[in-house]
């Protein structure tokens, strides 16, 4: 998709708008004829009172070029009028997409517009092409040009996770009926008020795609083009990687105010935990036009009419490729957004007599070539990594000698794919020259070029130091100049820079404060036989090291492989920043406490620029606890997550998630990046997620959220307990093939068990040993909706689902679960103690909660007064005993 920001003068605007006669269609619905919204109907139809008026022409509008003789205008006007009369001038309203429902929207016709609401987290703005929204639109024939203009007033909105929004949107598909809670995909071009990101180059004074000041507007204003979606089946998810998304900012007040890189907001009338404001826009004038040039988007000052910004989608044909004879244009609201659209004007014109299209410009891509590996190493065998945003050839030289390194001449580089090169370092400073020449035929698409095809050289320096001791001691007061002995401790940052395979870094108890993030970069790797250990010093008081990011740092990120992290706390990362992100492979994360961070406590995820095989894999998160993590909107901060970009073999064992703003666990996947690797969660507990004590706000509040976007992902939940979460206990979240074994769900606010999908045609759920039980909300059913699968995989004698009619837990044989069989139904905490703790060996202790008494464990199939051992989670003190603590000996230097 090729677009370019274009600013028009007032004269040019007049020429574009008035060089041919246009007809204005204004929606006029009298107050006493406003139609009520009927959720049983497919659409809200508002029509029958539109008027057609010809725009008065002045002498300045006359065009005497050949083919535009004024004497010919009458016949041309008649043709245009006929085309516009063929347009469907009836305004319609429809609600569709993920998170929408019959109780979460409103469409209120006004005298010359409409009020649109999407409430209670209904709908969401997404980059996958499957927005969930309330949409008010007209169908317009594809063979005529048009313009649509209106004033949008933002009456109220509540921030959650930047999926709120409003739009003036052109789409190539709209469902015929309301499609509540089901994905519906469409190519589109929109003026969008939602999450918009941009990078500003202060020297060039323009938005760039290279380095600069990055601003994340939560919310901002821009255009968004989504293409690559097949029109054959809008309810079917597109193939991963097939969807293209491009955004361009239309409002850049953050850069005018010279704000620091970060997250901001530009809209007023907002509620919730808002980001700092760089503007307070509550009303804006917007226009969308289809001309012979393309789809043109304009943003005007609503008071003066001055054009503030504009954008053009030149490859508009991508929205006109469907078999339908019409395109859809209108206004939208999503997720906690209420807007009033007034002064709607729609005009039509004939492409044959409209001004010819402008020449399509070439979009230029700035080169971004980067060595992504560390500048420090404690390993003589060192991995250097390189990435470029173009195909080309790379040569690596020793700068001191000018010699090409072994097998390092003309290495083929693929755009946005990391390339690794192994080398041996010399003690001290090692200087390398990376020379990259982009392919002159890149990129392989029309109207796009690199700004330079010249060879670029990058000087990369690696400082190699072998630490004095194999076990180094670090303290909060440690020095970069320390040697790692008890008498002369190192700083933590210095110890991490020069860590090497087999080394142990021992952290003294105390608070380690950071104003910025703490990163273990790529290339600082252990091995399978000799991992690098970062562990807490054992002490009689059981005091722990605490990494405190002061509300400004980005948390801790682990990019490397074969590390062991153990026994310390991570807290207070900045808003929207995770506590710990694991982006490497084969790491063991054990006994880490992540709490009160600005986003998810502990998350496994990689980069969408990397292929699946480069995503983090084979990581074990064991006996960790994550609690009271909260993002500003209460929509992102989970206890644990393994989502979006993860490979195979990631496991959570013996972990506890409670009082996190969003979910306990989140295994979300989206269509842009496709399915993720299988994740196993076992011997774990999720409870009371969705709210944080002492902080206003509520999130999604699911215990174990096991999928997303109707994508396959056979994630498995084993021997785990979910209770008193704000919403669902065990949630497939549209994942099509999750597996649940020997797990318990108790007294959750919504469904205890939810196995469903929103857009896939088939499911393949497997469940065995589910115990769903309630003492509250007895009328709450389960949400189990298998599609075209063997239902015996879900319904059989080893699953006890909640029967809301009989108000009991029962299996397919009619056997029920008695309260008397359960050791404890009490979730009340003792003062100063959570209802879930740990045994001395690290295993989870639930204090009898939802544990079947030994005498009621069925050992013979004939008995009906008990449950088989495989039904429900069992926490007997031996579920996840801690691994052996690494041995260490801190060096004591002589006085």
Task: Annotate each PLM feature.
Residues 341, 507, 534, 563-567, ...:
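All-beta strand scaffolds that present successive hydrophobic residues in beta-strands
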Residues 448-494, 511:
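Right-handed parallel beta-helix/beta-solenoid
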Residues 487, 525-578, 630:
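Right-handed parallel beta-helix/beta-spiral solenoid domain characteristic of secreted/periplasmic
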